[in-house]
Each structure stands twice: as structure tokens, then as C-alpha cells.
Amino acid sequence: ASTVSIKAGADAPYAALSMMLGEPMEYKEDAADDNVIFTRFEKSICLNTREEPIVEIHDFKDLYHLDEGIGSVIFDLDDTLYSEKDYVRSSFRVVERMLPEVNNIFNKLCAALEKGQPPLETVLKDAGMHSDELLLKCREAIRDHKPEISLYEGVKELFFELHTQKRSIGILIDGTPKVQRAKIEALGLDKMADEILITDELAGHGNVMEFRKPNDLPFLIMRKRLEIPCRNMAFVGDDIEKDFIAPKALGMECYWKKNEDGLYE
């Protein structure tokens, strides 16, 4: 006789116990054709059996009453927990201090942003000061600055409530690590979240875009750090196009914090 060994997913221990106890089990035909993920990170297969839609929330208090089975809540950052436009305005103040000779430069940068124009390039060209060297200096100063930003109303109270309910909190974000770390510190999230993961840090010297959402690897790493199954996790984001592809496929509960005043709305 020969033995066949199958490396299964997070439900393998449950399935093994059910078989040992002679309990009936439900199987899904052709599961590999629908909502199946194989991950080399955990060397496992995960089947998404969660059929719930993405839930739109209008107030952070809507997250006070999650299902009892949810042990961790993962949040996006930009335009989910704070206004990214506030960060951009904070960066414009840096440029204003650098270039006091440009009259009314802050308002001009804001106006270019609202028109969908590249603010720095537009304003510097209009002022007859455009150069690659000056652009680089401005961008370096922006990356190095401590942003003047604040959390949306209700975020601190929500985090306190989630911790009171013994639910862990994670922050999972794309973006330049130095910039995102500065935002996290300015918002005080480094003292409020249990785990923080910046996807670009996973790339090392490689292509950071490969690790950004909708890649599922950052979510699996977060799951491993928080030591909780994906089905017991919830994800909150603002970008309906890309934020929820991976967490939904992994079986997490998904909550959409629609932001009509977002930077990329």
C-alpha cells in the first residue's frame, strides 16, 4: 500500500479531526477552478468560502460591532485613516519655505493639484524656475519632512474600542517606506497598531510594484505575524478597484470606507 500526502491549507487540522471523529464533511467540486490560492510563502492552498459582499461603511462606529469571530482588523492608511490631501498640502508648505521668492506659491500649488496638473512642475514652469535639479531638491525635502497631518475623526476611538474587544490591529500600506513611516509617526499609529507592514519594504532592491496591492503576499505575512486565520480577519480600505482583491480572495471580511474627497477620487 502507498500513502498519499496532501499539503492542505488553514483548515487542514479541522478536516483531519473531523475525519478521525467520523463527522460528515462538505466538499466543493472543482474547487481549483474557483477562488483558489496557492501560496509558496506558506506552502499551502487556501479556498475562499466567504461569499459576503464588500460592505460600505460611512462612519467608523460601523466597525464597533463586528462578528465575534473577527480577531484582527487590518487598515489601509492613505485616505482611509487620514486625508492624503492634507499630506500633500503639508508638503506644499515645505516648498513654500524653500522658495519664498515665488509669490503665493502655496495657493498656486493647491490650485494645480485641484486641476489635476502636476503641481511642482506646473508652478515652477509658470515661475520660469523649472529644472530637474530644483525638482529633485523639492522632492527630497518633501520626503524628509515631518508631515502636519491628523487622523480622521473617530479613528482613535475605534482603535480603543477594537483593543477593548481584544481585537488586534494591523496597518498594511503601499508606498515609499521613508514617507510612509513619517506619516505613521506623525499620526501616532506606531503606538496604536499591533503590526505595521509597508509593502515596498518587501522588495528590497527589486521592483516595489510587484509587492503592492493587489498582491496577496503582504496579507499573508500580516496573517502570520498576527497569528490568526484569514477567515478571522477584516480589512478596511478606500480603493474599491485594488484594495479588496487579495483580502476578499483570502476570505477576509471587507469594509469599504468610501472617500469622496480622496486624493485620487
Predicted regions: what is each one?
Residues 72-74, 170, 234:
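Hydrophobic "anchor" residues on beta-strands that sit immediately upstream
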Residues 234-264:
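Acidic, Mg2+-coordinating phosphoryl-transfer loop and its flanking beta/alpha structural elements
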Residues 1-59:
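ATP-dependent carboxylate activation and anion-phosphoryl transfer catalytic cores
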Residues 66-69, 164-167, 222-232:
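Glycine-rich phosphate-binding loop signature in dinucleotide/nucleotide-binding domains
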Residues 156-164, 223, 244, 248:
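Surface-exposed amphipathic alpha-helices with a cationic face
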